[in-house]
């Protein structure tokens, strides 16, 4: 079915198609015809961060920034859905156009800039959702006009407001589309920010009587030395997990493409190699007690299996869905299942 819808979506501007696709998804969900888009994969239970996931294939943050489509997205077969990135106050993001397909390379360039309706709107949407399946992650960020020295206040505001509703929370310090945000990945800044957030997490755990896991999402453009430094800090502060990686500002393999000069983060197939290299390096430098989610460039089941081989416990999709549609979810689940069941695969990272 998606093969029939895709040409119509690709005739539209990428951001308009994004909205149209989500509206079509909701319509199919409400009318009971979502099964025509993709069949739900058989369960492949996976344990991570103290949570039980129906399967290890999730939706990455960015597709549903405000949590308006949670139930429909779960119905596509994802084991978990991550919504956001959300900020304390609503913000419009960067000027349009700000989203570009690169079909020749199965890539997408975006400079959205954390456009979202604000954390209060997201909280209301989450409360209105049925949430009768899967694990819900909420990705939090800072407003663009909040200076880095006060960034912790934005993250703590979001952490507190979403804590009771999230199954896990992701701290996004790696988007290239908010000026200066990636500076928070530098060793000292990272230590200061995550220390404050860990304190907030423990305070909220005591208040709510439950501990919600907190993950940190990192960039693929970190040098090896910076990856090592980040790993030291995140291990020292005992974060619950790491997501590797966000989009890249590099244009490897498409340097001469007409869109290569567009500012923003590149996702999809072009980021697969570097993202997986960062994932692999993190796995060798973090204790096994800190699971990794591999995201970046997954356009096939083989790509998902490659992330698992590099040390991921689970994976996330986004740009691959643009080109492959919802069938990619089941394909990735089955590829990971085959890898897990293969005698040579050893013990899966759980």
From Swiss-Prot:
<dbReference type="InterPro" id="IPR001295">
    <property type="entry name" value="Dihydroorotate_DH_CS"/>
</dbReference>
<dbReference type="InterPro" id="IPR050074">
    <property type="entry name" value="DHO_dehydrogenase"/>
</dbReference>
<feature type="binding site">
    <location>
        <position position="297"/>
    </location>
    <ligand>
        <name>FMN</name>
    </ligand>
</feature>
<dbReference type="GO" id="GO:0044205">
    <property type="term" value="P:'de novo' UMP biosynthetic process"/>
</dbReference>
<feature type="binding site">
    <location>
        <position position="85"/>
    </location>
    <ligand>
        <name>FMN</name>
    </ligand>
</feature>
<dbReference type="InterPro" id="IPR005719">
    <property type="entry name" value="Dihydroorotate_DH_2"/>
</dbReference>
<feature type="binding site">
    <location>
        <position position="65"/>
    </location>
    <ligand>
        <name>substrate</name>
    </ligand>
</feature>
<dbReference type="GO" id="GO:0005737">
    <property type="term" value="C:cytoplasm"/>
</dbReference>
<feature type="binding site">
    <location>
        <position position="177"/>
    </location>
    <ligand>
        <name>substrate</name>
    </ligand>
</feature>
<feature type="binding site">
    <location>
        <begin position="61"/>
        <end position="65"/>
    </location>
    <ligand>
        <name>FMN</name>
    </ligand>
</feature>
<keyword id="KW-0288">FMN</keyword>
<feature type="binding site">
    <location>
        <begin position="318"/>
        <end position="319"/>
    </location>
    <ligand>
        <name>FMN</name>
    </ligand>
</feature>
<dbReference type="GO" id="GO:0005886">
    <property type="term" value="C:plasma membrane"/>
</dbReference>
<dbReference type="Pfam" id="PF01180">
    <property type="entry name" value="DHO_dh"/>
</dbReference>
<feature type="active site" description="Nucleophile">
    <location>
        <position position="175"/>
    </location>
</feature>
<dbReference type="InterPro" id="IPR012135">
    <property type="entry name" value="Dihydroorotate_DH_1_2"/>
</dbReference>
<comment type="pathway">
    <text>Pyrimidine metabolism; UMP biosynthesis via de novo pathway; orotate from (S)-dihydroorotate (quinone route): step 1/1.</text>
</comment>
<keyword id="KW-0285">Flavoprotein</keyword>
<keyword id="KW-0560">Oxidoreductase</keyword>
<comment type="subunit">
    <text>Monomer.</text>
</comment>
<feature type="binding site">
    <location>
        <position position="217"/>
    </location>
    <ligand>
        <name>FMN</name>
    </ligand>
</feature>
<feature type="binding site">
    <location>
        <position position="172"/>
    </location>
    <ligand>
        <name>FMN</name>
    </ligand>
</feature>
<dbReference type="GO" id="GO:0006207">
    <property type="term" value="P:'de novo' pyrimidine nucleobase biosynthetic process"/>
</dbReference>
<keyword id="KW-0472">Membrane</keyword>
<feature type="binding site">
    <location>
        <position position="139"/>
    </location>
    <ligand>
        <name>FMN</name>
    </ligand>
</feature>
<comment type="similarity">
    <text>Belongs to the dihydroorotate dehydrogenase family. Type 2 subfamily.</text>
</comment>
<feature type="binding site">
    <location>
        <position position="268"/>
    </location>
    <ligand>
        <name>FMN</name>
    </ligand>
</feature>
<keyword id="KW-1003">Cell membrane</keyword>
<dbReference type="InterPro" id="IPR005720">
    <property type="entry name" value="Dihydroorotate_DH_cat"/>
</dbReference>
<dbReference type="InterPro" id="IPR013785">
    <property type="entry name" value="Aldolase_TIM"/>
</dbReference>
<dbReference type="GO" id="GO:0106430">
    <property type="term" value="F:dihydroorotate dehydrogenase (quinone) activity"/>
</dbReference>
<keyword id="KW-0665">Pyrimidine biosynthesis</keyword>
<feature type="binding site">
    <location>
        <begin position="110"/>
        <end position="114"/>
    </location>
    <ligand>
        <name>substrate</name>
    </ligand>
</feature>
<feature type="binding site">
    <location>
        <position position="172"/>
    </location>
    <ligand>
        <name>substrate</name>
    </ligand>
</feature>
<feature type="binding site">
    <location>
        <position position="245"/>
    </location>
    <ligand>
        <name>FMN</name>
    </ligand>
</feature>
<feature type="binding site">
    <location>
        <begin position="246"/>
        <end position="247"/>
    </location>
    <ligand>
        <name>substrate</name>
    </ligand>
</feature>
<protein>
    <recommendedName>
        <fullName>Dihydroorotate dehydrogenase (quinone)</fullName>
        <ecNumber>1.3.5.2</ecNumber>
    </recommendedName>
</protein>
<comment type="function">
    <text>Catalyzes the conversion of dihydroorotate to orotate with quinone as electron acceptor.</text>
</comment>
